Amino acid sequence: MNNHIEALSYYLGAFVDELTLLNVCDVVISPGSRSTPIALLMEQHEGMNTYLHVDERSAGFFALGIAKAKKRPVALLCTSGTAAANYYPAVCEAFHSRVPLIVLTADRPHELRDVGAPQAMNQINLYGTFVKQFTEMALPEASEAMYHYARLTTQRMIASACLAPQGPVHLNFPVREPLIPDFSLESLWDKGRGEYTGVVQQGNAVMPSEYVDSLVGRLSHMEKGLIICGDDSHSEIAAFATQLAEKTGYPILADPLSNIRSGHHDKTMVIDCYDTFLRNELLKETWKPDVLIRFGGMPVSKALTQFIKKQTKAVHIVVDESGQWRDPALVATEVVQASDIAFCSALIEKMPVMKKNDWFRMWQHINEKTKETLREMETYDTAFEGRVITDIVRVLPEGATLFASNSMPIRDTDSFFFTSDKNIQVMANRGVNGIDGIISTALGASMICDPLVLVIGDLSFYHDLNGLLAAKLHELNITIVVVNNDGGGIFSFLPQYEKKEHFESLFGTPIGLDYEHVVTMYGGSFSRVNGWEQFREEVQKGVTTEGLHVVEICTNRDENLTLHRTLWAKTQDVITTSLQGESK
């Protein structure tokens, strides 16, 4: 028995210690029995920060939020059985949004599998193709070879999670009883250290000089170009992309999640209203770029994606460090396996300065005309969902974070988050674009990003109410703006809206809940606003005071649809008139 406890303590102690040496210092733990030894060791290790979350589905997204904000791996620990299955949605999102999660699941030992033992199920490759790597850890043994194995396996798994494209990995730990480690053992954290501990160094892909010279030569003869920056771009992409734009004269179509629309950098070349003006048929038929250079994931804007797909005669250069490029439009003609920064740096160094021509001025002019028209909605007294975004940005302080939920909030952010000299970070879950786990992801991000404002619809808010517990347990500061249109507002913009007979029951799905009681239960403040002045006051109060603050603004789905369509129609008229004037 003592040999078992000694082996358990030293073996798992080496694993936990190696995590901290590899800078995995945050773990979200869901309570359970079989995971006891790992949980206790993590709690005891001075280099590890532990966060409790009792709901595994919310816990998975909470860890995802921390990892997104810190831009480094975060561990996630649960017991055996369906607890591990509840991590699945967060693992899927982490995989597709390229976020490194270290998923740790405790398991029954092999003799208790497939024999009807309680809380035992097949956890081998549980997450299938949604993790970059899976390993079934060996049972604890008291030997230097096994301590060495524990550390080296940890190194391999962390390296896999961090190698482009980043993503989740899964380690499954079979453990026998008894489960309580012995903390009186000498040198508990030192086993397997020293000569056995290695460090995985990851280099950057280098741009071949021959290709750079060739590309510079070609681009020098292509006056009509576009730089498209989507989600998952490098954190320093703004400075490099704007320099490249200045050299080439190509406008930057900046997705809000690229974080190029706001900040202290020069935004002369940044186009922010393309989602609206690329709906114009005359513009789409007459504006034909020679080359499109794309960084990061595909943009939120459907109009931009459709525009990209129509450019069948253009050169499409997709830059992706991993080589697993994202191209749902199926138009890529060249894929460059390099980091955004390496690509931009190589071109900036050798690219001659190309004068800003009529091509850039056309985009800039239409963008300004579109923005002028869209800003008219700031005079609307009605609770228009687009204005929710502009009014939040108006009161957000320097360095704040705006987290946009999926469905309508991220689309309104795309349409109405205009360029700003304030440094405002925009975040969202755009891996698989689900509405689950949004509250938890935002709360995880708020551990690092303060102040943070989450904009979320009422259905998405309902979907992750359990996530609010983290705000109470960990005393987090967050302001949540709930846009309550009593249902799935996005479906009003889709063809399903025309099927009136079944629309409300299948798509509108009103739930008629009063969220004030729930927010109060979790120790937060709740305010239901009436008017834009009160809305701005409540949001500002939220970002300047501690704790959980929920601000609810009620909108009407049909009225919101009409306002969007009216604004779009007016904008299209302005654009068409402007284009026809230019052609004369």
Curated annotation (Swiss-Prot):
Organism, scientific name: Bacillus anthracis
Pathway given in the UniProt record: Quinol/quinone metabolism; 1,4-dihydroxy-2-naphthoate biosynthesis; 1,4-dihydroxy-2-naphthoate from chorismate: step 2/7; Quinol/quinone metabolism; menaquinone biosynthesis
Function per UniProt: Catalyzes the thiamine diphosphate-dependent decarboxylation of 2-oxoglutarate and the subsequent addition of the resulting succinic semialdehyde-thiamine pyrophosphate anion to isochorismate to yield 2-succinyl-5-enolpyruvyl-6-hydroxy-3-cyclohexene-1-carboxylate (SEPHCHC).
GO molecular function, one term: manganese ion binding
EC number, UniProt record: 2.2.1.9
Protein family (similarity comment): Belongs to the TPP enzyme family. MenD subfamily.
Pfam families hit by this protein: TPP_enzyme_C (PF02775), TPP_enzyme_M_2 (PF16582), TPP_enzyme_N (PF02776)
GO biological process: menaquinone biosynthetic process
Cofactor mode of binding and number, as noted: Binds 1 thiamine pyrophosphate per subunit.
Protein name per Swiss-Prot or TrEMBL: 2-succinyl-5-enolpyruvyl-6-hydroxy-3-cyclohexene-1-carboxylate synthase
Keywords for this protein: Magnesium, Manganese, Menaquinone biosynthesis, Metal-binding, Thiamine pyrophosphate, Transferase
Subunit organization: Homodimer.
Transmembrane segment boundaries: none
CDD domains for the chain: TPP_PYR_MenD, TPP_SHCHC_synthase
Enzymatic class: transferase
Catalyzed reactions: isochorismate + 2-oxoglutarate + H(+) = 5-enolpyruvoyl-6-hydroxy-2-succinyl-cyclohex-3-ene-1-carboxylate + CO2
InterPro entries, sorted: DHS-like_NAD/FAD-binding_dom, MenaQ_synth_MenD, MenD_middle, THDP-binding, Thiamin_PyroP_enz_TPP-bd_dom, TPP_enzyme_TPP-bd
Cofactor(s) recorded in Swiss-Prot or TrEMBL: Mg(2+); Mn(2+); thiamine diphosphate
